[in-house]
């Protein structure tokens, strides 16, 4: 796995040696970012189930200002930190080892707001709608913020109150829906 484009392009990333995580493939990541827009002009990124940190690092590589990368696994957070070091710009990233709910509370208490959020949780279908609702209720999303929800091919994500679906892709065995805050 590697960074595909932007200032960190072609840098290889470490991945987790675990069956519990399924990193987003370079092909899916490339298609996803191509559909969002190749490059960005600032903004804040949140990845609540960061795994290796690849999506948040890719977003910063392509022009976002900073990313908060969250994972409950200590092993995942070690991998994320090693990948962040590869950027040589560690100050643009924050790694939180905690649950999604704890991260939301911490970030709300700090008054953080995000422009791009990645959601690829285990047990995706049940959790994504709840988390999107919490992000909205806790005022963590800027106006027109994008939420990228990734599931496997068998899960169907519904419409979510407060959001519009702006993109819906099936990329191999991966489904990706992009929601925009209303």
Task: Indicate where each model-derived feature is located.
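Class I S-adenosyl-L-methionine-dependent methyltransferase catalytic core
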Residues: 1-182
């Amino acid at each position: 796995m590697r960074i595909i484009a932007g200032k960190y392009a072609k840098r290889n990333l470490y991945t987790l040696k675990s069956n519990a995580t399924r990193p987003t493939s370079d092909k899916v990541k490339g298609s996803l970012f191509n559909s969002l827009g190749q490059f960005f002009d600032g903004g804040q990124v949140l990845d609540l189930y960061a795994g290796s940190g690849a999506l948040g690092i890719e977003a910063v590589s392509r022009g976002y200002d900073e990313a908060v990368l969250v994972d409950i696994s200590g092993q995942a957070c070690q991998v994320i930190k090693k990948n962040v070091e590869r950027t040589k710009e560690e100050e643009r990233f924050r790694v939180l080892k905690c649950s999604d709910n704890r991260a939301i509370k911490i970030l709300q208490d700090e008054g953080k707001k995000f422009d791009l959020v990645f959601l690829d949780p285990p047990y995706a279908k049940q959790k994504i709608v709840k988390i999107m609702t919490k992000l909205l209720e806790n005022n963590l999303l800027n106006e027109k913020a994008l939420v990228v929800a990734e599931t496997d091919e068998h899960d169907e994500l519904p419409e979510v109150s407060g959001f519009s679906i702006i993109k819906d892709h099936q990329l191999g065995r991966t489904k990706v829906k992009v929601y925009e805050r209303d």
